[in-house]
């Protein structure tokens, strides 16, 4: 069996540079190189390996620049033969695994430098270093696989956000993420001044102004601004019902109808009104509801004096005086005072009919139309 001393030499862990390669390193990188070479040398000495104090070690110890091997193959002219063997007696012999760990940590220093400066010295500067990694792979125990560690380390995310700590492999993704913190919105609409962080979002928004509707239904000719809207609309023609209730198996064409149905299974209404029997999930909701029976209206409009039982109703009412319409349709730009009015309006664009009759299955876009229809059955 090959002895441990024979399997690893100083040249196995040495990193050689040509003159051209050395010029590419800055001051900090050269300092790191000196530290790495000295630590490799000391690690081998500490386990009793026969080491020749090479020219590079002597120069590093004296504070001079290390040797730079001329030629394409740095290993063809070895400086080890220029100096005699230097032994350090009395050094405690570490275990094989401890030695390998120390060498692994040494290589990690190099890898750390490579990651920080966004280039790989092992490929761009000196391909011979790959042989050093391979020589260690044979003698490393399974939990110290240097090549495996190297692969996982070098693909580590190099771009880290200073705000939240999230890291990215690609600079493009990192820059795009940073905008979430800085809220930079460089893409501004020339028509209304609204700004967006991404150009694609601006392009989508501008369709509102130019009236572009590129997605046309082949069955009825109706056009839509977004492809997703066309896909939803086409369910009217195909009869597709992709939303299935896991509780009862009932299927639905529209996601809104499906969500409304699911709530009927999951919502527990434990608070019941003693006046009308209506149940509520929260006690606060029951308390607000009770005002309809008592006639209590504690919230009064300061402009017209009209009173309301809930603050939300008062806020909505005041928009009549201020003219505020915060809910705007992305399709046509029409604005509404209430969100419910916007949702009802959007159905005219999508063709959605979320209100379905339990008796005959006929669907309607407006709840009021469903109520009128149900009178036929009663």
Curated annotation (Swiss-Prot):
InterPro entries given in the database record = KRAB, KRAB_dom_sf, Znf_C2H2-type, Znf_C2H2_sf, Znf_C2H2_type
Domain called KRAB: residue spans = 8-79
Q: Which compartments is it annotated to reside in?
A: Nucleus
Q: Which GO terms describe its cellular component?
A: nucleus
Q: Which domain of life is it from?
A: Eukaryota
Q: What's one GO MF term for it?
A: zinc ion binding
- Give a yes or no for keyword Zinc-finger in this entry: yes
Predominant place of localization:
nucleus
ZnF C2H2-type: positions: 159-181, 187-209, 215-237, 243-265, 271-293, 299-321, 327-349, 355-377
CDD domains xrefs: KRAB_A-box
Which chain positions lie within coiled-coil regions?
Answer: none
GO BP annotations, alphabetical order:
regulation of transcription by RNA polymerase II
Q: Which UniProt keywords apply?
A: DNA-binding, Metal-binding, Nucleus, Repeat, Transcription, Transcription regulation, Zinc, Zinc-finger
Identify the PANTHER family for this entry: RIKEN CDNA 6720489N17 GENE-RELATED (PTHR23234:SF10), ZNF44 PROTEIN (PTHR23234)
General function of this protein: May be involved in transcriptional regulation.
Task: Please report which protein family the annotation says this sequence is part of.
Answer: Belongs to the krueppel C2H2-type zinc-finger protein family.
Q: What is this protein called?
A: Zinc finger protein 684
- Organism of provenance: Homo sapiens
């Amino acid at each position: 069996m090959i002895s441990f001393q024979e399997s690893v030499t100083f040249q196995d862990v040495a990193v050689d540079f040509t003159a051209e390669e050395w010029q590419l390193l800055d001051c900090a990188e050269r300092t790191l190189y000196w530290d790495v070479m000295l630590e490799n040398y000391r690690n081998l000495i500490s386990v009793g390996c026969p080491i020749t104090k090479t020219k590079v070690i002597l120069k590093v110890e004296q504070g001079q620049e290390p040797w730079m091997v001329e030629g394409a193959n740095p290993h063809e002219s070895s400086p080890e033969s220029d100096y005699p063997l230097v032994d350090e007696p009395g050094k405690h012999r570490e275990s094989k695994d401890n030695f390998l760990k120390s060498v692994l940590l040494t290589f990690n220093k190099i890898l750390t430098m490579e990651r920080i400066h966004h280039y790989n010295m092992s490929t761009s500067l000196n391909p011979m270093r790959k042989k050093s990694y391979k020589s260690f792979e044979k003698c490393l125990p399974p939990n110290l696989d240097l090549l495996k560690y190297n692969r996982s380390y070098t693909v580590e995310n190099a771009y880290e956000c200073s705000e939240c700590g999230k890291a990215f492999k690609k600079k493009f993704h990192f820059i795009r993420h940073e905008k979430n913190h800085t809220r930079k919105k460089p893409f501004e609409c020339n028509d209304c001044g609204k700004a967006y962080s991404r150009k694609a979002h601006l392009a989508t928004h501008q369709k509102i102004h130019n009236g572009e509707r590129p997605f046309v239904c082949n069955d009825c000719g109706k056009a839509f601004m977004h492809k997703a809207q066309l896909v939803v609309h086409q369910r009217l023609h195909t009869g597709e019902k992709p939303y299935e209730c896991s509780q009862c198996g009932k299927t639905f064409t529209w996601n809104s109808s499906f969500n409304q149905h699911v709530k009927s299974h999951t919502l527990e209404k434990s608070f019941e009104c003693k006046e009308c029997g209506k149940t509520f999930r929260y006690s606060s909701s029951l308390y607000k509801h009770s005002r309809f029976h008592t006639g209590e209206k504690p919230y009064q409009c300061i402009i017209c004096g009209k009173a309301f039982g809930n603050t939300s109703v008062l806020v909505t009412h005041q928009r009549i005086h201020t003219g505020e319409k915060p809910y705007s349709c992305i399709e046509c730009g029409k604005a509404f005072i209430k969100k419910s009015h916007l949702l009802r309006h959007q159905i005219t664009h999508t063709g959605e009919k979320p209100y379905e009759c339990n008796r005959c299955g006929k669907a309607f876009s407006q709840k009021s139309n469903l109520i009128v229809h149900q009178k036929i059955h009663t």
